[in-house]
């Protein structure tokens, strides 16, 4: 059913997407995830086309602190985020300041994500608010919190890339825009040659 984690990591290292499923008792959704470091305009367009269009950029707390990206509710700690059903740590949204226009195009959003992963970026590199939503990952990764946010950052770390990912929730191409569940994600992955993994199996891999 799922691609072995080591094979998925090798795929991810090549600047390619991986589909990550969470637990059926949690969101029961698949996220399309790639590394932000080298995300292309074409990849961003593919992500927007097949997802809800709400593109997020999971990152470590260290990077979020360096870039001065506070949580949407000032002073709210990760553990106290009761306003989001699954405790997702949303920060203020951003656009990269140089080289973009409105910030919403695939070109502009890919530039913003690459800038978030660029170690030379500073708080002044970004306009706030913008069209990319950074997410703060739990420091312990999926071993602390079984979320897509943490899975994205863990995949980047395991691949030797900057720990900033790009994620979007996969949706079906139907009139209601329903969320893709496991069977849908399996079919989508097979059609597009994208590995499918689960957060639980990623956690077990990290425990080894």
From Swiss-Prot:
<keyword id="KW-0539">Nucleus</keyword>
<dbReference type="Pfam" id="PF00926">
    <property type="entry name" value="DHBP_synthase"/>
</dbReference>
<comment type="similarity">
    <text>Belongs to the DHBP synthase family.</text>
</comment>
<feature type="site" description="Essential for catalytic activity">
    <location>
        <position position="131"/>
    </location>
</feature>
<feature type="binding site">
    <location>
        <begin position="145"/>
        <end position="149"/>
    </location>
    <ligand>
        <name>D-ribulose 5-phosphate</name>
    </ligand>
</feature>
<keyword id="KW-0686">Riboflavin biosynthesis</keyword>
<feature type="binding site">
    <location>
        <position position="27"/>
    </location>
    <ligand>
        <name>Mg(2+) 1</name>
    </ligand>
</feature>
<comment type="function">
    <text>Catalyzes the conversion of D-ribulose 5-phosphate to formate and 3,4-dihydroxy-2-butanone 4-phosphate. Also has an unrelated function in expression of mitochondrial respiration.</text>
</comment>
<keyword id="KW-0464">Manganese</keyword>
<protein>
    <recommendedName>
        <fullName>3,4-dihydroxy-2-butanone 4-phosphate synthase</fullName>
        <ecNumber>4.1.99.12</ecNumber>
    </recommendedName>
</protein>
<dbReference type="GO" id="GO:0005758">
    <property type="term" value="C:mitochondrial intermembrane space"/>
</dbReference>
<keyword id="KW-0597">Phosphoprotein</keyword>
<dbReference type="GO" id="GO:0009231">
    <property type="term" value="P:riboflavin biosynthetic process"/>
</dbReference>
<dbReference type="GO" id="GO:0008686">
    <property type="term" value="F:3,4-dihydroxy-2-butanone-4-phosphate synthase activity"/>
</dbReference>
<keyword id="KW-0460">Magnesium</keyword>
<comment type="pathway">
    <text>Cofactor biosynthesis; riboflavin biosynthesis; 2-hydroxy-3-oxobutyl phosphate from D-ribulose 5-phosphate: step 1/1.</text>
</comment>
<feature type="binding site">
    <location>
        <position position="148"/>
    </location>
    <ligand>
        <name>Mg(2+) 2</name>
    </ligand>
</feature>
<feature type="binding site">
    <location>
        <position position="27"/>
    </location>
    <ligand>
        <name>Mg(2+) 2</name>
    </ligand>
</feature>
<dbReference type="InterPro" id="IPR017945">
    <property type="entry name" value="DHBP_synth_RibB-like_a/b_dom"/>
</dbReference>
<feature type="site" description="Essential for catalytic activity">
    <location>
        <position position="169"/>
    </location>
</feature>
<keyword id="KW-0963">Cytoplasm</keyword>
<keyword id="KW-0456">Lyase</keyword>
<dbReference type="GO" id="GO:0009060">
    <property type="term" value="P:aerobic respiration"/>
</dbReference>
<dbReference type="GO" id="GO:0005829">
    <property type="term" value="C:cytosol"/>
</dbReference>
<keyword id="KW-0496">Mitochondrion</keyword>
<feature type="modified residue" description="Phosphothreonine">
    <location>
        <position position="3"/>
    </location>
</feature>
<keyword id="KW-0318">Glutathionylation</keyword>
<keyword id="KW-0479">Metal-binding</keyword>
<feature type="binding site">
    <location>
        <position position="88"/>
    </location>
    <ligand>
        <name>D-ribulose 5-phosphate</name>
    </ligand>
</feature>
<feature type="modified residue" description="S-glutathionyl cysteine; by GRX2">
    <location>
        <position position="56"/>
    </location>
</feature>
<dbReference type="GO" id="GO:0046872">
    <property type="term" value="F:metal ion binding"/>
</dbReference>
<dbReference type="InterPro" id="IPR000422">
    <property type="entry name" value="DHBP_synthase_RibB"/>
</dbReference>
<comment type="subunit">
    <text>Homodimer.</text>
</comment>
<dbReference type="GO" id="GO:0005634">
    <property type="term" value="C:nucleus"/>
</dbReference>
<feature type="binding site">
    <location>
        <position position="31"/>
    </location>
    <ligand>
        <name>D-ribulose 5-phosphate</name>
    </ligand>
</feature>
